[in-house]
Amino acid sequence: MDKKTIYFICSGNSCRSQMAEGWGKEILGEDWNVYSAGIETHGVNPKAIEAMKEVDIDISNHTSDLIDSDILEQSDLVVTLCSDADDNCPILPPNVKKEHWGFDDPAGKEWPEFQRVRDEIGKRIQEFKETLV
């Protein structure tokens, strides 16, 4: 079976998409190539790194990346995680499916907000995996 590719996109590739990439690699495993990117790059938020560390997922080596058209066009599924990314997502080829999974932006908020959003993203990716079986 060929590996499928999922591409998580948010506005700055700083918090939500970084956590989604970490969860995606953990939950979807070897069957999927998992990437994340942003409409802009804001650097990986240290609180996102810390939040994922709490659930034993290391995203400290992640980089904040702009959308890569090659990855985008080869993706099986593009998932936008905020309305800005959903509204500004580049036009996709017909073979690429797009879904919007909206999550609150924890940036600039208190620590419990990072934990809540982290857990919501993990739960949504787990639910997605269960639909694949």
From Swiss-Prot:
<feature type="active site" description="Nucleophile">
    <location>
        <position position="10"/>
    </location>
</feature>
<keyword id="KW-0676">Redox-active center</keyword>
<feature type="disulfide bond" description="Redox-active; alternate">
    <location>
        <begin position="82"/>
        <end position="89"/>
    </location>
</feature>
<keyword id="KW-0560">Oxidoreductase</keyword>
<keyword id="KW-0963">Cytoplasm</keyword>
<comment type="function">
    <text>Catalyzes the reduction of arsenate [As(V)] to arsenite [As(III)].</text>
</comment>
<protein>
    <recommendedName>
        <fullName>Arsenate reductase 1</fullName>
        <ecNumber>1.20.4.4</ecNumber>
    </recommendedName>
</protein>
<dbReference type="Pfam" id="PF01451">
    <property type="entry name" value="LMWPc"/>
</dbReference>
<keyword id="KW-0059">Arsenical resistance</keyword>
<dbReference type="InterPro" id="IPR023485">
    <property type="entry name" value="Ptyr_pPase"/>
</dbReference>
<comment type="similarity">
    <text>Belongs to the low molecular weight phosphotyrosine protein phosphatase family. Thioredoxin-coupled ArsC subfamily.</text>
</comment>
<dbReference type="InterPro" id="IPR014064">
    <property type="entry name" value="Arsenate_reductase_ArsC"/>
</dbReference>
<feature type="active site" description="Nucleophile">
    <location>
        <position position="89"/>
    </location>
</feature>
<dbReference type="GO" id="GO:0030612">
    <property type="term" value="F:arsenate reductase (thioredoxin) activity"/>
</dbReference>
<dbReference type="GO" id="GO:0004725">
    <property type="term" value="F:protein tyrosine phosphatase activity"/>
</dbReference>
<keyword id="KW-1015">Disulfide bond</keyword>
<feature type="disulfide bond" description="Redox-active; alternate">
    <location>
        <begin position="10"/>
        <end position="82"/>
    </location>
</feature>
<dbReference type="InterPro" id="IPR036196">
    <property type="entry name" value="Ptyr_pPase_sf"/>
</dbReference>
<dbReference type="GO" id="GO:0005737">
    <property type="term" value="C:cytoplasm"/>
</dbReference>
<feature type="active site" description="Nucleophile">
    <location>
        <position position="82"/>
    </location>
</feature>
<dbReference type="GO" id="GO:0046685">
    <property type="term" value="P:response to arsenic-containing substance"/>
</dbReference>
